[in-house]
């Protein structure tokens, strides 16, 4: 559990915080008016997980902090919203995440530890990432170029690994890049990923993904391959460097239209202090024709690592990027 005073994580059996000695709540007791979804989740998971609190959520699912009762390690439970669990299409989309992610074993991909389904409640279990998301960091403002390059290089290597196994993520965005306790970047949420041989993935004719990070071909509902994820990584990199994505609009259609038809302003034109060579890498990722982008995630990772090296950086940024790249040897499956 997390200390309500200082935020330090403690085992569920602890009575006081290991850091500040504050009294910790007894998580074995349910709150007087528990959230209905938490109540259902506790019923479904039984004694296996100690569900502690809601961390947040999106349009598809709610995310809860829990502790594995036997291993005493913090985990995250992602629970499909109840009304969506009744929709066969969304139900299959949620199940797809567990199936897709279970095939992926890479140090820069958040693994699925477990999954369950009972009484209309569907959930997946993942390790808790205490470092937050890239979105959290960007929320504080534009990030240092070397850090952005390292984070995207790690994500690119992880996605290359997935692509070589026939899986395209399709929803790469800052929210889906998380950090572990050591600051390593991990890609998560393969919720709309699908093996290439299954063909296009649309819902009732709609393009799937997040408009601000969606490739042109995805916005048009076309078949996509790994280069769609490269485009999305370009937008993630752009946002990390300047603090906002290249395209915005009053609605999803307007943003999607710009993804297809408009050329983004170079990051250098937004902030002249951004290195031109790094901006060129970003703009290549954002090429409208997929053939003009980096062909593979490893190609992008290599370009970013070379750029980091050119700055003279030899610290954690270079180490983390290079470690991720070595975990994804070219040609390996």
Where do the protein language model's features map onto the residues?
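Protein kinase catalytic-loop region centered on the HRD/HxD motif
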Residues: 157-167
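C-terminal lobe helix-coil module of Hanks-type protein kinase domains
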Residues: 67, 159, 178, 210-316
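Juxtacatalytic C-terminal regulatory tail of Ser/Thr protein kinases
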Residues: 25-38, 291, 295-333
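Protein kinase glycine-rich loop
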Residues: 52-58, 63
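Activation-segment/catalytic-loop signature of the eukaryotic protein kinase fold
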Residues: 115
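AlphaC helix of the eukaryotic protein kinase fold
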Residues: 81-103
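Conserved short submotifs of the Hanks-type protein kinase catalytic core
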Residues: 119-133, 137
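Activation segment signature within eukaryotic-like protein kinase domains
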Residues: 151-152
């Amino acid at each position: 559990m997390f200390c309500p005073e200082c935020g330090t994580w403690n085992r569920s059996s602890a009575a006081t915080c290991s850091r500040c000695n504050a009294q910790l709540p007894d998580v074995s007791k349910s709150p007087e008016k528990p959230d209905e979804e938490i109540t259902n989740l506790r019923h479904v998971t039984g004694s296996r997980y100690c569900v502690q609190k809601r961390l947040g959520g999106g349009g598809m699912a709610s995310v809860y902090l829990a502790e594995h009762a036997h291993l005493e390690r913090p985990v995250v439970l992602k629970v499909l919203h109840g009304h969506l669990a009744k929709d066969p299409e969304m139900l299959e989309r949620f199940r797809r995440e567990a199936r897709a992610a279970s095939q992926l074993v890479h140090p820069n991909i958040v693994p699925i530890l477990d999954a369950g389904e009972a009484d209309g409640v569907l959930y997946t279990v993942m390790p808790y990432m205490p470092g937050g998301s890239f979105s959290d960091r960007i929320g504080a403002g534009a990030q240092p170029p070397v850090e952005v390059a390292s984070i995207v290089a790690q994500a690119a290597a992880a996605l290359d690994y997935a692509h070589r196994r026939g899986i395209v993520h399709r929803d790469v965005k800052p929210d889906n890049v998380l950090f572990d306790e050591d600051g390593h970047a991990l890609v998560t949420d393969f919720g709309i990923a699908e093996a290439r041989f299954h063909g296009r993935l649309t819902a009732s004719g709609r393009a799937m993904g997040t408009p601000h990070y969606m490739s042109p071909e995805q916005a048009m509902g076309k078949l996509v391959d790994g280069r769609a994820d490269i485009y999305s990584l370009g937008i993630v990199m752009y946002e990390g460097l300047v603090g906002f994505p290249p395209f915005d609009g009053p609605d999803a259609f307007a943003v999607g239209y710009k993804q297809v038809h408009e050329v983004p302003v170079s990051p250098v034109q937004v902030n002249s202090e951004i290195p031109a060579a790094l901006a060129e890498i970003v703009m290549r990722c954002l090429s409208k024709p997929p053939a003009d982008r980096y062909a593979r995630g490893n190609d992008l990772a290599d370009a970013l690592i070379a750029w980091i090296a050119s700055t003279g950086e030899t610290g954690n940024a270079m180490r983390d990027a290079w470690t991720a790249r070595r975990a994804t040897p070219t040609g390996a499956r």
